Amino acid sequence: MRMTVRHVRPPPVRTAQVTVLFADLRGYTGMAERLPAARVIPLLDEFLRSLAAAAENFGGTIFHMAGDGLMAGFAVDDDSGNGAHDALAAGRAMLRDFAPIAARWRRELEIDAGVGVGLHFGDVAVGVLGPSQHQAITLVGDTVNVAARLCSRARAGEVLFSCTVAAALEATAATDAATGAVPFLQLPQFELRGRRGPIDIWCLPAASRLAL
């Protein structure tokens, strides 16, 4: 019997204004070195489940989850909002929810771990990538790259966000409501690798930065 493979045409690429969130695990390299690989998998699963729940609780859509981190988009299907408040609240929830997990890992496994989060708001392309049997909807564009770079610069226990996110928050009062009145800092401009010109950065700071 001959089987016919149907190739379904993917939906057209569209553009949207989205707040993109990246989050990843600090301390993963040391964890992978010290523990058997089979022991690392359930720890990563616990970590990613915690992050995903925080993102989805604030309306985020998970677009990529691999290894020690994830990418989520906020307001992807909502033309009436920018997702900045929800993304910032989700980032803070990730830090809060992972804290007891990290404490248990430290107590039981002597592993130091934390979460770093980066946010950027702007235009993205929403489209399907990959061969038919492995297709996935994803976000592409400079906004995604900047969010990823900010995540890589964030310290454990910290959310870094760009000037576009700060502008999208619209007012200090709204920011305070989204962050639970946690102080946020404007950092000196810095260059992001592979991108022209410095950008303005704000953060919900880690204790290590507040102690400086």
Task: Show where each model-derived region lies.
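Acidic/histidine metal-binding catalytic segments
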Residues: 66-67, 107-116, 159-163
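Catalytic NTP-binding/metal-coordinating core of nucleotidyl cyclase/transferase enzymes
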Residues: 7-89
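Short, surface-exposed loop/helix-turn segments at secondary-structure junctions
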Residues: 129-141, 175-183
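Cytosolic regulatory/linker segments at or just downstream of nucleotide-handling modules
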Residues: 153-212
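A structural signal for short, well-ordered beta-strand segments
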Residues: 20, 70, 115-121, 201
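Alpha-helical scaffold within the catalytic cores of cyclic-nucleotide enzymes
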Residues: 45-60, 76-117, 142-143, 148, ...
